[in-house]
């Protein structure tokens, strides 16, 4: 028996393609943005454990905000009445990927915020960001994971210091290029 989608999946899993893991495990040691209200995060609490007479299995609960750790943002996070993840549906959650690499600029300035000019430089090299794209920001900030202090960029005065997106850049990708989502390696945009 053969199905076209299985064939496509088989091809995608072949040596012709490289799969890159971009996620981190979530647990109570996972770093997250310090502005999240107290009590909003509870990761990996065991609600059923082995030996429970009612249900012989292990079940964990996870409670956390949608913008937690490194994450994906949809237009509604920045654009009032913008699209949320629910808008897209499962069949649309595969997007063309565009990666704006600003690692060199971040190495010079920890507070660097990607600009419209950075995006236009990307487009001059690779072509326009396609409609419905996932636009990711590469800063190499993920190399600070899993240290809460390092990934937060916490200074001696308690301030958080890390790179991110500028609002004009976000408006450009969402309003001018109709991006579906954006991503970044830091705990906040």
How should these model regions be labeled?
Residues 1-189:
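Active-/binding-site microenvironments in catalytic and ligand-binding cores
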